[in-house]
Amino acid sequence: MNLRTFKKGVRPSEFKEFTDGKSIEILPLPDEVFIPVQQHIGAPCKPVVEKGMDIKTGQIIATAGGFVSSLIHATISGKVKAIESFPHPLSGQGLMIQIISDGKDEWINTGENVPKVREWEKLSKDEIITDVQNAGIVGMGGAAFPLHVKLSPPKGKTIDTLILNGCECEPFLTADHRMMLEKTDDVILGVRLIMKALGAEKAIIGIEANKPDAIEKITKAIAPFPNITVQPLKVKYPQGAEKMLIKAALNRNVPAGGLPMDVNVVVNNVGTAIAVTDAVMRKRPVIERVVTVTGKGIREPKNVLARIGTPFQNLIDFCGGLTEDAAKVLMGGPMMGVAQHTLAVPVIKATSGIVCLTSESIVDKKEYPCIQCGACIRVCPMDLMPTRLARFAQNCKWDEAEKFGIVNCIECGSCAFVCPSNIPLVQRIRIGKLKVNEIRRKQKTVEKVESN
C-alpha cells in the first residue's frame, strides 16, 4: 500500500478502539434544544423567530448575518421558550434560541422533505450551491466554514481537485470512520455533487491506514468513477489539517497566509459530503450530526446521531453516564478540543466528539523554563519556531511575532505535546495570534478611513 504523508508531526496514542467498531446509534429526541446563532466561522446569524412562536423541524430560525455566514434551522418542533445567552461550548456564553419540544418532530413543508429521485446531473452549479446555502451547511469536520463560500471561489481561482478528508487524525474520534462505512453511497454522491459545483476534474479521498475497512469499502464504491481515487495515508497527526492533507495527497504547498484554493484545491470533510447529499437530494437542512462520545470517563462509549442544540448531558446519559473518576469533558479530541465547564452546553455543527477523561489521564504538570531542545521545531508541520513565538506573545512583542509567522500556526498542539518543559505553547501562541490579527484589523480600518 502506497502510504503518503507530510513532513514532521507527531504520533499520539490513537484510542480509537473504544468506538471504531460501534455502529451509529440515534439519540432520542431531546425535550429541549439550545441552538446558538454562532456555530460557524463568520458573522453570527440573526434570529427571525420570537419567544412563544410555534416552530417546526427544518424551519429557518436565524438568517445569515453576511455572505460568510450560514442559515440556522430548528432541529425539533415545538415552541420558542427564550432567545437569550446560554453556556456555549466554544465561547463560554452565547446567544441561543431555546425550543421546547412538542414530541411530534413535525417538519415544515413535510411533502417537500420526503426523499425523492432527483436527476442531479441536470442541475447547474448555481442550483447545487443554492441548495447547500439553503441547508446551512458548514464544514462538519470542526472548522465550520460556510460551505457555499468554499464553493464560490473568486474570479481567476479555478479548482481542479477536491480532496475529501477521511483522515480523522484526532485521537479517540471515530464518527467519520463510521460514516464512511455506514453511509458510503451518500459520501460518494456528495463528492460528485461538490465536484460539479466546483467544476473540479478529479477528487481524492484521503483516509489514514488505520481504517482499512473504510479504505476497502470506499474503493469499491468509487469503482465506476475513474476521476475519484482513494489515497491511503500514514497514521500521523495532524494528517487531517488542510495544508498537510494537500501536501500528502498532491504534493502541493499552500503558501504562507494562503488558502487551499491558491493551489487550485478545495478540502471538505466526510460529514460535509453527506450533508450535501441530504441538501440536494432530500432538501434536508443540517439539523443533526454524528458525535463520538468516548474516553475512559464514559461508561458506554458510542457513536451517536444527535440533533443540533441537544445538551451534552443528554448524550452522556445515553452512553451510561460519566464514570466515578471522570475529571474532564472535552468537545473535540484531546489535541485540539476545548474543555467544558458545564454539560449544559449544546451540540453544535462543529461538535465531532465528546471526550471524557479520567483523573488518571490528566496530569497537572509543572512548567519549567525552555531548555532550547528544539523538539517543538522538529515536529511543527508549519515549519515555525513555537518556543520563540510563545515567548514573543508572552512579552507582547507583536511585530516580532508577526514577522516570525505566528498567524500561520494551525494550533494543532504538536509542539505542546512534545515539550519536555511542559510550556503551554499553543495557548500562548493562540493569544498572540488573536492580538496580531486584532492589530491587523485596526490598521486596515485606519487605512480605509485615510484613503477616503
Regions found by a protein language model. Give the residues of each.
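Short, well-structured beta-strand-loop connectors
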Residues: E50-T63, A82
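Acidic low-complexity segments
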Residues: P87-F145, G156, P212, T229
